[in-house]
Structures are given as C-alpha cells and as structure tokens.
C-alpha cells in the first residue's frame, strides 16, 4: 500500500470519527430534544448545557474530547505497527487529529453543519503532545472564568496550545508539521467563532450563567 493511500485512510478514519455528533445524539436519546433547535443551534457541550441537562453537557464534552484523542491514538498505533512491519513509518498521528477536528466542524451526517471544534481540538492536543493539552485546558478554563465568556475561553485555549507547540521538542520536519496543523485548526476554530466575535465586539455575547 502506498504512503498516499495510507494517509488517505488515516484521514478518512479521523474524519468519520470526528464527525460523530455526540451532543445531538445524547440530547435526542436522553433529553428528547434536538439541540440544533436550542440556543445557538450548535451541537457542542456549551449548547447542550442550555437544554438544562448538565449531565448530558458533561458527557458531550467528554466524548468530543475523546474522539479527538482517539483519532490521534489510533493513528499512532497504526504508525507503530507499520514501523514494526517495515522498519519505517510516517508520522500520521496529527493528520488523523486534524481530520477529526474537521469532521466535528463539518460532519457529513449533518450536511456539513457541525460544532466549533474546541473540545475536539483539546482532545487532539492532549494526545498529540500532552503539554499542549495542558496549556489548552488551563488557558481555556482561566480565560473563561475571568471573562465569563465560553467562546473567549475556547479561542484563547486554541491560540495558547498553538503557541506552545512552537516550543515542542521534535525534529525540524515534525515540528513544522505540528505548527502548520495546529495553526490551521486554530484559524478554522476562530472562523467558526466569527459570530461570537461579532457579538463580543458589539457587547451582545451571552456570558456563562446568563439566562438564554
């Protein structure tokens, strides 16, 4: 099997895993509600919380983080197996993670209308390089707590993780790939938050704890 075919398979696996809309599934199964008809219409944990089900929001957050991490870990396992068989293997782990992030934002099952990718990128960060995951989580929680804006927390976390990757100890080639893919995910994440950014600038963004 050619390297190109392997990369396509890894990307497809990551995308399909990332495109599973756990927020929508959980809200429908246990909350009898279509989360797309609630609040912002987003399928992520923040909007699931607006249904009044903290338990479902927590599960959504867990699974959205998990699918990003799982995509990276599965790709890592495959790369390791390939190395054992052939003596060489490309590092395809972050390609799978970026694909999972893309799948969450643009899931094929929902007409390519998905979430904003914060939790999934957090999972990718933890699995790709745990330091980036810790930086992401701390920056997200602190900025959300200080500003009381969930959107600000997610955006600051993604930017902080991308900056941290610039100091990642790795070969030049792998380092450049990580910087490029983390930067790409962050740019897309910011684009997915463009509505939030407009509301922040106009003073109309909802704060954490505000009634919807």
Curated annotation (Swiss-Prot):
Reactions listed under catalytic activity: an acyl phosphate + sn-glycerol 3-phosphate = a 1-acyl-sn-glycero-3-phosphate + phosphate
Listed SMART domains: G3P_acyltransf
Q: Which family does it belong to?
A: Belongs to the PlsY family.
A molecular function (GO) term: acyl-phosphate glycerol-3-phosphate acyltransferase activity
User: Which EC number(s) are documented for this chain?
Assistant: 2.3.1.275
The job of this chain, per UniProt, is described as: Catalyzes the transfer of an acyl group from acyl-phosphate (acyl-PO(4)) to glycerol-3-phosphate (G3P) to form lysophosphatidic acid (LPA). This enzyme utilizes acyl-phosphate as fatty acyl donor, but not acyl-CoA or acyl-ACP.
Which HAMAP family does the UniProt record give?
Answer: PlsY
The record describes its membrane topology as: Multi-pass membrane protein
What pathway, per the record?
Answer: Lipid metabolism; phospholipid metabolism
What is said about its interaction partners and assembly? Answer: Probably interacts with PlsX.
GO BP annotations listed = phospholipid biosynthetic process
Q: What is its main location?
A: membrane
Q: Cite a GO CC annotation.
A: plasma membrane
Protein name listed in UniProt: Glycerol-3-phosphate acyltransferase
Q: Which UniProt keywords apply?
A: Cell inner membrane, Cell membrane, Lipid biosynthesis, Lipid metabolism, Membrane, Phospholipid biosynthesis, Phospholipid metabolism, Transferase, Transmembrane, Transmembrane helix
- Per UniProt, the enzyme's principal EC class comes to transferase
Q: Which organism is it from?
A: Zymomonas mobilis subsp. mobilis (strain ATCC 31821 / ZM4 / CP4)
Q: What Pfam families does UniProt report for this protein, alphabetically?
A: G3P_acyltransf
- What compartments host this protein? Cell inner membrane
């Amino acid at each position: 099997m050619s390297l190109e075919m392997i990369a396509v398979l890894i990307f497809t696996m990551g995308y399909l895993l990332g495109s599973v809309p756990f927020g929508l599934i959980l809200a429908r199964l246990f909350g009898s509600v279509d989360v797309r008809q609630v609040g912002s219409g987003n399928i992520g944990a923040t909007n699931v919380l607006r249904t009044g089900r903290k338990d479902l929001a927590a599960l959504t957050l867990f699974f959205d983080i998990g699918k990003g991490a799982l995509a990276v870990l599965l790709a890592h396992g495959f790369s390791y197996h390939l190395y054992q068989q052939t003596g060489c293997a490309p590092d395809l782990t972050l390609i799978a993670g970026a694909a999972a992030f893309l799948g969450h934002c643009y899931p094929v099952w929902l007409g390519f209308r998905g979430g904003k990718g914060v939790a999934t990128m957090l999972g990718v960060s933890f699995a790709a390089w745990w330091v980036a995951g810790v930086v992401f989580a701390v920056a997200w929680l602190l900025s959300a707590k200080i500003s009381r804006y969930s959107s600000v927390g997610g955006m600051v976390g993604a930017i902080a993780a991308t900056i941290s990757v610039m100091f990642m100890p790795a070969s030049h080639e792998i380092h450049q790939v990580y910087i490029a893919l983390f930067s790409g995910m962050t740019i897309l994440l910011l684009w997915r938050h463009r509505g939030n950014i407009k509301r922040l600038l106009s003073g109309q963004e909802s704060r954490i704890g505000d009634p919807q």
